[in-house]
Amino acid sequence: MGTPARPGRRRSLSILPCALVLAFLTGCSSGPGRSTSAAAAFSVADGYLAAGETVSPFDDVPAITNLDPALRSAVQQAAQDAKARVDMRISSGWRSERLQRALLEQATTASGNAEDARRFVRGPETSSHVTGRAVDVLPTRADDWLIQHGSDYGLCQSYSNEMWHFELTVTPGGTCPAPAADAEADG
């Protein structure tokens, strides 16, 4: 009878590092309410967006203009086609190596260890954000729309623990592969 309590406990313990990293990410990189320390250290030239800021896929900022042209075009077309249902916003696109390195360091501090941090934040040497081949999309309704329709544009959700993270993975109209469990599992 003690067995049913154990899985729930494991689930709670495994959720804690995820919650810490998500709180960090929300506070620093891809969501509203980024930390002021990150704001002081980075600029829009690094792909950094200020606290609570999102951008349109059509904005003229490095987080968008430094995206791979094919990805940028696919995201712009998807946003245009989705606009009757949802206003698709980008919370993070291209990032400088310097910003990506700092995000990983801060996620490691927030989660308590590098292994948990790497489930959500890759290092600059392997990050798709650094190469301009990934975008983080908000709001959740836009993520839901892209999960359903993104393959029409070649856009697929990359990680099951990051519903907001999309990459150009298949040819338009293809079938998206199942998302990897997390960034660590994919790398």
Regions found by a protein language model. Name each.
Residues R6-P32:
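Secretory targeting and sorting signals
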Residues S30-G187:
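Cell-envelope/glycan interface and biosynthesis
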